[in-house]
């Protein structure tokens, strides 16, 4: 095998060796005999096919398998020589030389190893911070918003003009030119003005109408509207406003608190205000975490922790980022790059710094998460994808299959792990 290994640093190594002809022939013979036991060939009983016939028919594939096995043995020997466990191997080794000759195949391989990260006490990396306070004014404002949202609907005073926030009971019918279109008609439809639940311009043109009034309005369906027949079309809607309803004023009270907190046997206004205060405090904490502290924490970790990165992983990340950016380029830019390899290399190199940081953060998060006992379970991963797909109006099962088929689940899991870890560390800082 003539194995030679070189450890460049703690995360990178090379291995050189020869896949000797005798070893390759030995493996080819064994693979041929194994195949002869299982393959069915016309003119021979199963299990009785001569190895020579197998080699003649499947020689190229068997040779590839023999070389693959021999290469794996060389790699295993290289790891042992380097004092590394197979579990430390990161990514697929890159073959940089594969020279076939009469006596075998000369091979050189680049190897990436899991980096060695020395972690201090986790909270030493967390920036100092104070949680925002919650004022009485904020609590009262939220309380009044809640009271307004839960207020019952009541008929508006006679003669009131429709305005934003009001509820309009309408009959409507839509037309393309003189022809009514399917799905464009409803009676006694309750529409909150300003809810933006109808196509743009529809609700705005109802403002100022009074109960009993009729009006024709003109709107244009969005270009990306779900119905191809209606997408981008100008339409007329005939509207009849039958009734205006408004939210009846409701003063917060103990009784109101009981209706909002039915699960609390001792619910009262003070308890409701405490719950509101907790909710606002949580919202402010999440906003502070996401807008400022998580970024600072990651910056601290990247600056404080120095370790070698496997070059193969960094190069793969650069390739990934580079390919993703190509989709945003114009046809002219793509064509220019296609004819200029130096420009391609320069464009790719622009992403080295960000890709290197991304890889470093991934290894840090993985190491810290193991130290802190943080993990993302399969049910959490699936639940997140389901919620996101429903929020986008997509089929959750189809979205999950898309992520699986495009090997995107590991990236989603890592993003969730990073967020979960950073939140955990910041919460631990609060506890002291």
UniProtKB/Swiss-Prot annotation:
It comes from Wolinella succinogenes (strain ATCC 29543 / DSM 1740 / CCUG 13145 / JCM 31913 / LMG 7466 / NCTC 11488 / FDC 602W). Pfam families: FKBP_C, Trigger_C, Trigger_N. Residues 165-250 form the PPIase FKBP-type domain. Consists of 3 domains; the N-terminus binds the ribosome, the middle domain has PPIase activity, while the C-terminus has intrinsic chaperone activity on its own. This is Trigger factor. HAMAP family: Trigger_factor_Tig (MF_00303). Keywords: Cell cycle, Cell division, Chaperone, Cytoplasm, Isomerase, Rotamase. The gene is tig. Its EC number is 5.2.1.8. One of its GO terms (cellular component) is cytoplasm. One of its GO terms (molecular function) is peptidyl-prolyl cis-trans isomerase activity. Belongs to the FKBP-type PPIase family. Tig subfamily. The lineage of its organism: Bacteria, Pseudomonadati, Campylobacterota, Epsilonproteobacteria, Campylobacterales. It is found in: Cytoplasm. It comes from the Bacteria. It catalyses: [protein]-peptidylproline (omega=180) = [protein]-peptidylproline (omega=0). Its main location: cytoplasm.
């Amino acid at each position: 095998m003539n194995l030679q290994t070189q450890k460049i640093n703690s995360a990178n190594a090379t291995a050189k060796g020869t896949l000797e002809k005798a070893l390759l022939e030995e493996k080819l013979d064994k693979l041929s005999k194994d195949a002869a036991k299982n393959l069915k060939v016309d003119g021979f009983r199963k299990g009785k096919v001569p190895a020579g016939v197998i080699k003649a028919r499947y020689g190229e594939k068997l040779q590839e398998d023999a070389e693959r096995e021999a290469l794996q043995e060389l790699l295993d020997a290289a790891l042992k020589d380097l004092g590394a466990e197979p579990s430390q191997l990161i990514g697929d080794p890159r073959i940089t030389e594969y020279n076939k000759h009469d006596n075998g195949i000369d091979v050189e391989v680049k190897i990436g190893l899991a980096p060695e990260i020395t972690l201090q006490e986790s909270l030493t990396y967390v920036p100092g911070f104070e949680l925002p306070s919650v004022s009485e004014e904020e609590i009262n404002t939220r309380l009044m918003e809640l009271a307004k949202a839960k207020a019952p609907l009541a008929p508006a005073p006679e003669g009131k003009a429709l305005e934003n926030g009001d509820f309009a009971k309408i009959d409507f019918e839509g037309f393309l030119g003189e022809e009514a279109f399917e799905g464009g008609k409803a009676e006694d439809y309750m529409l909150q003005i300003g809810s933006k639940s109808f196509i743009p311009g529809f609700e705005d043109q109802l403002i100022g109408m009074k109960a009993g009034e009729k009006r024709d309005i003109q709107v244009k369906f969005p270009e990306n509207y779900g119905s191809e027949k209606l997408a981008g079309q100008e339409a007329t809607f005939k509207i009849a406003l039958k009734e205006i309803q408004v939210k009846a004023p409701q003063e917060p009270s103990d009784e109101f608190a009981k209706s909002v907190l039915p699960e609390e046997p001792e619910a009262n206004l003070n308890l409701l205000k405490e719950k509101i205060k907790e909710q606002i405090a949580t919202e402010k904490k999440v906003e502070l975490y996401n807008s400022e502290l998580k970024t600072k924490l990651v910056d601290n970790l990247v600056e404080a922790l120095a370790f070698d990165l496997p070059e193969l992983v960094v190069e793969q990340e650069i390739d990934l980022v580079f390919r993703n950016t190509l989709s945003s380029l114009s046809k002219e830019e793509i064509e220019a790059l296609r004819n200029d390899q130096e420009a391609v290399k320069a464009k790719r190199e622009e992403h080295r710094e960000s890709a290197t940081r991304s890889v470093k953060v991934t290894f840090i998060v993985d190491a810290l998460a193991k130290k802190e006992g943080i993990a993302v379970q399969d049910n959490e991963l699936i639940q997140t994808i389901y919620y996101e797909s429903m929020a986008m109006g997509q089929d959750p099962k189809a979205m999950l299959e898309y992520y699986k088929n495009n090997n995107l689940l590991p990236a989603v899991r890592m993003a969730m792990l990073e967020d979960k870890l950073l939140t955990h560390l910041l919460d631990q800082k609060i506890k002291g």
